């Protein structure tokens, strides 16, 4: 039997009492159970899920207990009423039941008399489940946790809002301050009127202002957030790279548009009209010449029109720019450019030839006068395509610099750059080779009367400059006093152009055009330089201070007119030395070439031209040298690439010396070697003269029994004979005609250009053979030494001669002793070696001149009057030598006579012996010794010639290097102690030493440091106290002194663009700093004026200063002033510009057009060509040209050869720069004005200038 569940009675009683006291529901109810069907009234108390019932509400113990957990309480219907009276007398009852989940437990039935009370009990019992309470508790806990999270979030948001409010309050305060300030400035009148209105109106306006500020703040916050986003991207490296890349593309579009326009002018203004002219009845030009001049020009124009349209299409899709496919289109067409490049030199030659036709020249001038050409010549337009490919290369360099490595166009752009660089190297060589032709044609166009001799494409331009020409009467006046007034100087000023064959003397017209003077075209073969350096000290005592040591005379003896003398005066010693050196070298080259082409020894069939032609190293490319197809002034192919050793060999080759090669070498040797190497080479040539001539040429020179033609074969044909329109010509040398070759006799290397001191001073007599029997000139006498000399035969070199090092001897006299020792050795051995054959004489050491035979001892110099002597200078009738076809006088004999006339060492017997060598039948050994003598003299003259050019034109090399200066002086002193030295050679060496040791006075040329020192202690005066003329003059003086101080070696290697630019190019950086200082100074001077009228007056005055600078040819100052006025800080001052006069604005536009960078500064270049020095050009123009050359081609080829074509182009630019540097202004420094121009006390930087401009004229609200 199941036991009953035991309960703790005490605990139940306690709960019952608690239910009686704190129960949820209490009251009397009637209950009925299954055990007792009668209704019993009990007092019930509900405590949680326990239902207690008591007998009465005062019973101490409960009668029973029901556990309500899991039960169901609900209303029950009333039972059917009985018919008994007892039931009918009862009141209506309300029933409800409690059903338990356990089926064994019976339902509890309860009733109450009140329906409301019944519903409340049902509801209370229904809620008395612990499970329901636990569920509600869980739900409440979830709500509680959620509310806690919400509270925390709200706290964070509240904190952020409070921070934003604080920031907003600060910003509001700042904006209120700004708004207040703005309103005070702009709305002062309106604020005052609003203050007079009523309080109601004030309240409305304040509300409107608040709303406006609120709206402004909301918009400002949005804009600020968006601005931050934009600024973050703008400052990113990617955005910066893309921005620079876009700028490169936009610049490329502008340059391409300009280039297409240039090609359009070339085709429409020249090509097509000339085609029509060639089809006329009397054509001024043939169709073949038109095709040769304009080969592929029209095709190139069409190609670039397509390229330009494609580039515009790419720009229209900005910011997405895809360019690689454009260059892919261009690359297959490069063969068209290559044909144009190869034809470029030929086209200019054909053009120069056609311009000799007056009808064509007149027609061409009409075409060039069209407005579209803008005063540019046809040669200029033909050169534009040569610069386009290098411009593409620079653009591709910049694009690749700003293109990421992972960019899709990177590989394509790299490939395009490599292909264009290959063509660019060819183009640079062509431009270098044709520059001389274009220069000659440009000068010819500047001469109003024309100058046909400049249309000779074989002429080489050497130098130009402004010299003063004096007549003989003015010369005599100048020796008694000053030269004269400024007007007299201006009238005597001449613009001189030196070419390899002619000297052109012109005057400058008002429009910049040149006019030939009387006898202004001088053939150099008729000239003799009459400068006498040895008499300078005596002349200086009587000459005026203005022309002291600065004048030089040129004696001219034309063949078809009377002789005359030209007296020219340079502005400085250095300029005079440069002019005389170049004139001497040009005269020497042209005379010696003339002598070379004529007969001197009929007994020999070997000639110097044949000797040059037989030397394949002069025209055939080799591993260490490559040639162009252009010839230099000595009719030898120009060097394109060469090793350093081959360049030094060309410098010391005794057979010729081209003036253009010498100038280029001396300008650029620092790039590939140093001064000590050059000096060692010259010393070695002096000590070993035979090493200056190639062995094969020596063999030919000393060979008299072999036919050179049979030995070496025919020379190649002329390059022009096989020239085609679009193919490069073969490398070849022109030949002489058979009849001329038959007349040629044995010549010597000195006659081909190496003799620069004696033969350079030869004069050409206007008479012919009548001069042969003329007496000696009475102007000077020559004393001839009658000392005896021993005849010696040629022997191989002794070991002492072979191993002589090319260094300066430590002891005085060692050099001359070494040379004398070789002669003594030969003299002693000659008696035992009389039977040596000619084959043993291929290399001979320098020996002394052989003695004169006794049969000539009693003859006098008057029997040989073929040469004249004038003041100690030999005056030979070289034209008679050139024109005489039957002359039997050898070049060796002629040279011997010439040198003997100027030398006090050899006797007259030696002179007569040398003249008769050609006809007296002496042995070959004696003839070879005669040639050795000439070669030795040629070597000495070559060394002195190069040193003279080096010292006179490049003095800074010796001023900055004391060791080099000391070595040269020691070497020259040793040369002067040589007993075999001729008088003219000794004088030349003495002049070089005097030039090295002479300290130039700087009284007439104020240096920049001295000018700055003059301003110390000077009080700065305001701008209004200085006239515009004084400012312009002093600014020009400062600009010229800064520009003049730049040494030309700084122009090599782009040092101004390197990281160490201040160390490598300090003077170029100083010039740049000065330019920026003046530009900032002018802008600051304009901005500092608070009054509008004062600012307008300052602008007008500075424009007037710029115009005066233009008249002074100071184009650098013009650009300084115009660039400062065009700054944004000044250009935006619209109210100020309204006060500026129209005339000033028109003048400013004219000046800006003059110095504009359009077309590579074409207007500025034209002005520089049409002006006479002194002049200050814009340095940036030349630096741009140099960068263009440096970027286009390297200094060395892949084989390690020096790019000499590049050096030649850079040398030509430096030559133009030095032309402007050497001519100085005659302006006296004024310390007050200079102190004002150098004052930096009130200067502002770019940012401060713009801020001051905004204060003057604030930006208008948008």
UniProtKB/Swiss-Prot annotation:
Tell me where in this chain the Ras-GEF domain is found. 1027-1259
The entry's stated outcome for residue 263 to Q is: Loss of function and oligomerization
For the region Disordered, what residue ranges are annotated?
714-738, 800-854
Segments forming domain PH: 22-130, 460-588
Keywords from the UniProt entry: Guanine-nucleotide releasing factor, Phosphoprotein, Repeat, Ubl conjugation
* Stretches assigned to the N-terminal Ras-GEF domain: 635-749
Task: Give the matching InterPro entries.
Answer: DBL_dom_sf, DH_dom, GDS_CDC24_CS, PH-like_dom_sf, PH_domain, Ras-like_GEF, Ras-like_Gua-exchang_fac_N, Ras_G-nucl-exch_fac_CS
Its Gene Ontology biological processes? neuron projection development; positive regulation of MAPK cascade; positive regulation of Rac protein signal transduction; positive regulation of Ras protein signal transduction; regulation of neuronal synaptic plasticity; regulation of Ras protein signal transduction; regulation of synaptic plasticity; response to endoplasmic reticulum stress
**Bias (Basic and acidic residues) ranges:** 821-839
Annotated ranges, domain DH? 244-430
Q: Which residues carry this modification: Phosphoserine?
A: 71, 581, 617, 745, 766
A GO MF annotation of the entry reads: glutamate receptor binding
Expression by tissue, per the entry, reads: Brain.
Please list the residue ranges annotated as the IQ domain: 208-233
Q: Does the keyword Membrane apply?
A: no
List the GO cellular component terms: cytosol; growth cone
Q: How is it modified after translation?
A: Phosphorylated by PLK2, leading to ubiquitination and degradation by the proteasome. Ubiquitinated and degraded following phosphorylation by PLK2.
List the PROSITE patterns hit by this protein, alphabetically.
DH_1, DH_2, IQ, PH_DOMAIN, RASGEF, RASGEF_CAT, RASGEF_NTER
Instruction: Describe the protein's quaternary organization and the partners it interacts with.
Output: Homooligomer and heterooligomer with RASGRF2. Interacts with USP8, thereby regulating its stability.
Question: What note about domains is in the entry?
Answer: The DH (DBL-homology) domain mediates interaction with RASGRF2.
Q: What is this protein's function?
A: Promotes the exchange of Ras-bound GDP by GTP.
Q: Which named protein is this?
A: Ras-specific guanine nucleotide-releasing factor 1
Q: Report the source organism.
A: Mus musculus (Mouse)
From the broadest rank down, the organism's phylogenetic lineage runs: Eukaryota, Metazoa, Chordata, Craniata, Vertebrata
